[in-house]
Amino acid sequence: MCLLERVSAWDTRHIRCEANSHRDSANPLRAHGRLGAACGIEYAAQAMAVHGALLAETDSAATSQRPAMGYLVSVRGVTLHVDRLDDLSAALSIHAERSGGDSGTVLYSFTLHAGPRLLLGGRAAVILDAHGLALPQRSATTPPKS
């Protein structure tokens, strides 16, 4: 599912994307005939993922490594300034700013706007290549520990 239409600007710390999919009646995030404002978090997460891919593409020329897969593990301080997104006529502008991190985690702050109107904002944490953090899988023949 790709909700974003274009990247309008980006650098090593920021990305700005645009989307019109919030008005699409077939938007996969719609429920009960509406697209709630909290769905804006998915728009922001997709912008963060695109930012990571763009950074990895620039780095991969030097390192020949495949991009790290990221997992959104936390959103904090989210403030919703509207109830829904599907009734907005203006395009969504999604801005994410990388505010910190290391080789295993990335921290972002994000906002969504429709024109000058702030729709929501918050912070997110992403873990990169989390497969190493997975719990060991139990076999079907091994009884659970009590």
PLM features: what roles do these ranges have?
Residues 18, 95, 109-111:
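Beta-strand residues in well-ordered beta-sheet regions across diverse protein folds
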Residues 99-145:
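Mixed-charge, glycine-accented linear interaction segment located at domain edges/termini
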Residues 1-3, 92, 106:
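Hydrophobic core residues within well-ordered beta-strands of beta-rich domains
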Residues 4-5, 75, 107, 121:
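Hydrophobic residues on conserved beta-strands that form the core of alpha/beta folds
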Residues 1-36:
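Catalytic strand-loop segment that frames the active site of acyl-thioester-processing enzymes
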Residues 6-9, 82, 98-100, 126:
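A residue-level detector for short acidic-glycine micro-motifs
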Residues 31-51, 69-70, 77:
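Compact, glycine-rich, soluble single-domain proteins
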Residues 50-95:
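Hydrophobic beta-strand-centered segment that forms part of the acyl-chain substrate-binding groove
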